[in-house]
Amino acid sequence: MATQVLIAHTGQRLEVDTAQFSHLDDFKAWVGRNTPVAPKHFVALTPQGRTVKHASLYAEACCPSQKEIYIYDIRMSQAPSSDGSPSVVSQVPPPKRYSIPNAPNSIENVQAIASWQELYKQRRAWAVHLLEDCSAMDATARARFEEMDVMIKCVDAAVANLELSIKQIEPKYTELKKWVEPALEEHARLSTSWQQYLALARNTPVSPSMVKFMTRGQASKSNATLEDLIEPDTAKKAGTLAPTAHRRFNDKATELDRAAKKMYQTLDALIADFDKLMSRSVLGRSDESTQLLQDIEAVVKQIDSDYRTALSYSGSQKDVAQASKTASNHTERLVPNLKKRAKEMDDLLQYVTTSRNTVASDAVEFMRAITEITSLRGKLKDNIGILNQSEDDMTTFDYLRLIQQLPYMYASFLVEAIRRQEWNEKIKADSSTLANEMALFQDEEAKRRRRWQKMVGSTYGPGLDTNVIGLEVSVLGDDNSWPSVNKDELVAFLAALKDQETEEAILEDVGRLIQELNSPTKQQSKRLKAFKNGSVHEAALGRSGLMIRGDDELLRSLQDDKSKLESKLKTAESRVRRLEDLLHRQSQASRPGNLFQPQTNSIHERNDSASSVKAAPTDRQRASSEGTDTLLRRISELENELREEKQRSSRIQNDLSNRATQHDDMKNQIREVNSTKKDLLENMEALKREFVLERKSLEDEIKTLKARLEDTEDEMEHFGESREKERTSYEERAQQLEAELERIDKERRDEMLKAQGQVDFLRNENRIQREQRDTLERELQNTKDAGHATSKRLEALQEAADAHLQSLKELHSQLTGNDPVPDDGDLADVIQTKAADLLARLQNMESDTSLIRGDLDRTRDQVKELREELASTKDKLATEEAASIHVRECVSEEKAKVKALEHELAETREQLSRARARLADGETGSETLQKRVEEEEKKVASLSEELASRQSQVGSLEEELHLYKEKQEAACARASELTQRHETRDERSKELTQRLYSQNDRLCHLLERLGYAVSRKEGTMTITKVPRAERAAQNPNDSSDPGTSLRKSGMLGAKALHESADLDLLYWWNSADAATETEKYAAFMSKLGDFDADLFADTIYHRIKEVEHKARKWQKEARSYRDRAHIAQKDAHDKIAFRHFKEGDLALFLPTRNQQAGAWAAFNVGFPHYFLREQDSHRLRHREWLVARINRIQERVVDLSKSLQANDSASINDEENDNPFQLSDGLRWYLIDAQEDKPGAPATPGMGKSTVAANNVEATANIHTHMAGAKGKNRDSVHSIEGINKTLSKSLESRRSSSSSKRALPFAGAGAQALLKSNPIASETNSLRAAAPETPVATSPVQGGLLSTGEGGRPQPGAAGSSSARRPNDGPGEASGNGDAAKTAEPRRMLDRQESTGSPTKKSVVWDPLWSVDYTYESPGKK
């Protein structure tokens, strides 16, 4: 499952497989590449609010949903700075209001059906365009909802993290609070009452010996008090410092409470604000855009359906009327409805965007509040640490507490001294008693032995009398250092404390010590509790050290007798109670009913009778006779009734007595049950108390471990900060080293300049060396030519090995450029990594492109504004130039006027001078001349003023002209700068356009090389996977370039860059006017520049996930196969192997025939030539078989040439003979060192089982690779005897280099028995012998199995000549013929085996005892 990565402040949602990150820093780097969150500002949390660690990157969630990781930027929690740094708050600009175009509503001819169809077509196009715009708005709205959801989830996780951190510190604060409040009260009491405690200690007398013992002999006063146990100076100093320490401790506790209160209040406010945010969340309206889009789609489908229906109309009047009616329906109902839904979609988009920006701002505020609460938590934690580390204050109050607890301490020492004294006395008394008792037992035993020896033992001699074993009791250790104290001193000490008005708590503690001194010990309590329900529980009683001679049986019999007597006593008491009850009942029943009833009736009768006698004597006689009969009857009736009542009363009494007995028995049973239930309840209560105590201790331990875990996490965080600081120092050091390197580089350049003078001297030497080098190069060329042939051969061999890697390497080269290709095993992982990097680069490039597009738009707007400003500036400049020209003309006119005035003034002055001269000469009258002079002077003054004003006006105009010139120059400079900036941005836009195009082209080529085809239709990019058959069918013979076998994309990869017709769009900026440029840019973005990065990412992601799924599947299968292999290996460890022999296997070794003496081979199927190295411990001469465990296997090849050379040179080497068994040349065989697994096994298989010689094993070669009917056709085949003979008769060199010697060659045909003795393979199948004549061959059904006729191999049980039809499941030795061996062996070439179908009554004289021995051997380890 991919992991969802959620960015808190932007609302982004990314997907990544965290298994590719080996460290958390890699994940940080990936986040930094794909998001604006830098690694140094990186914070990651899980949905539960826990910090993401390296181990949690690989931890998969238990639920099937995807795992999520929340990423935060720590700059979110920082207050906004005033230095102009960019804000972290992600604000999306509100979209422009969507202007709904009017629907087409004009028709040329209402009577022509074609006009109506054209109107329907235009309305359909209008509706489709509106649907596309609404779809885009729906996608944008859903994206905004998704961003809000991500932001709220991240805030929720941050709040959960804050709650977790506060919950971690809360137990510490609670525990500290429980301790602080009583501590403050105690400190206040100690700081005010310490003098009272000191006075109590000063006035309380104690035992001098005990004081001397407690102070280690430092205090030895005769009249000792409790004050002697402390130092008065230290006590006074502690009492002086106590108020200050108490005030300081109280201040710390108050600060702790204040910090905790502020933290909890802020946390409650934060949670309340978050609940408000959740309650007013707009996520509940996330489905509105989809519903609106569905409504719009329904309307558009209706319009499209009407359009298609209108296409089928003919030109009839009815169809025209129907078309008009449908168009009216569109105009009145569908078109307004569509506009209304589009307007609602636009309003929803505006609302969602505003809500998203609000949530983003609220999220940042929440993060800042969380940071503030976290700082308060850190302050609270520091306060807790400060309060816990108040050692000086605690030391002061500890000493004062010691002064307070002096009576208790002294009493505890007294109690301990009394207990130790009692223990010593008990040990001495019990040891003496035990010694005396054991001496009596020893004496009794000695007397008994003497009596027995005298009566019986002396019969066989006097030597049977021995000493009686005795017991010596000795007491170890000496505990006499404690002073002698009795209980009276302790009671007197308690009375002295009561007399001085000591605190009740101290008196209770001392009284409790005295009570504990009188309470029984644990063993005594156990013995007291042993008596339950009138019986003794031995488990609770324990064992006594002074039992009578330690006779458990005697003690048990006595206890049984006691229980029997107690049961008899209970029975007797029950009977006595029953008899007493019966006696009481009988006495109550035998009493008369009423002894004092009145006799009035009888007297009255007698009176009546008397009167009657007197009255009538005759009647009396008659009445008396009748009354007598009546009375007799009445008496008999009453007697019968009395007898019945007595019987009924006796029955009732018996019933009552029985019921009373049953009631008593039931009461006794209920009493016993209640007592048993009471005991059980007490036991359960005790267990409950133990469990509660254990649970409390475990909870305390859990709290302690959680606190330690939190401290450890804090230390890890501090360690990370120290790592950051260390890395910063390393970076500074690297900068210093770079500066040093630059300095060294500069010095090196200086040295190079200095060394330039030496170059000329070295050139001559270089020339000489060049000549030598040429010589060496020629020699090297010769060597290269010589090795060229070898390299060609190596290249030919390597081409076959590199063919299957070429496609991956080409893909790697396309992805990575010039990077080196990794190893074969890492190539797929590298390609995955590169694909992920390309995806990240594409996303970064798209984000950069979007930014650059925004910059480009802004730049265009600025350029446009600057151009407008430049035009306005030019207009102003032209106006100013015209004004300046006008001013210049005015100035020139004024100058001309000034010159004229000056000329006129000069003339006037000349006239004045002449007038003055004339006046002087007396030519005219003085008055007239004076008037003229005054006039001329006034005229001159006015002209001078006018001249001055005109000159000042000319100066101001010149200054204004100079100012306009400066403005013109500044505007020209700004215009040139903007033009240059615009050209620079144009170049950058060209570069970005080309890079975007090339990146899109490369990504399309990457998709094509990965087996996908890219196509575009109606502005939508589609990526489809090319089937493997189509990829293979395009170019099946070309395996060098995997890209050529893939279908080319229809988007960018169909043509080369210089051949594509769409390349004109790539140069969209080379346009004559702005409209053409805008049109080309839009066409470029729709055709070449638009690339669906999300679809590309999903495709690459799914492809990688498919690869990972296959890898996990294969890994799981490999793990299951490995487990099965381990199980099979474990099962096979104690079973006899018959193939794939290796060290540690059990093997069955059998002697061979027609070989040198001592040739024993391993029983095998398809793995011949495994011979046993004989050892003295094997004792092979006395065995018929050997089961041994392989210690070592040596592989050897028979080389007869070495033997011939050794014979020719007549030299004998000390080396071991490589052909001790006389095998054929070139044959590969194996020498096995084995150790018998069960030394001491019987030398013979069993009684009556062996009927052949020790070295003769009877078997038959009955292997067929073909049917019996095809024997004549395959005589020259490789698998026939002739083929084997030809193969074995090859040259020595070819036989050594062939691989046919590595496995056994099966042979076929019934005549193989005769051929085995007349060809070379007879020496290599010496373990097989011709079958008996009566054994039928090739008549049994074919069975699948593996069988070998290896040289020196064991006989094959599937073809044993003397064996008949085998019993099923005879033992492990028969695994050579069934499928069980194939389950644990590697797949080999299977041969068809035909078993012999001899007589079912015939038994194998060799294998039956072997299987029985094998079964006995493996029976202990059978699984």
From Swiss-Prot:
Q: Which Gene3D superfamilies match?
A: 1.10.287.1490
InterPro entries, per the entry = ATG11, Atg11_C, ATG17-like_dom, Cleaved_adhesin
Basic and acidic residues bias locations: 631-648, 1383-1395
Polar residues compositional bias, start-end = 585-602, 650-660, 1034-1047
- What's a single GO BP term from this record? piecemeal microautophagy of the nucleus
Q: What does the record say about its membrane topology?
A: Peripheral membrane protein
Q: Which PANTHER family match?
A: RB1-INDUCIBLE COILED-COIL (PTHR13222), RB1-INDUCIBLE COILED-COIL PROTEIN 1 (PTHR13222:SF1)
- Subunit structure as annotated in this protein's UniProt entry: Homodimer and potential homooligomers. Interacts with ATG1 kinase and the ATG19 and ATG34 cargo protein transporters. Interacts with ATG9, ATG17 and ATG20.
Stated name of the protein: Autophagy-related protein 11
What would be the name of the gene that encodes this protein? ATG11
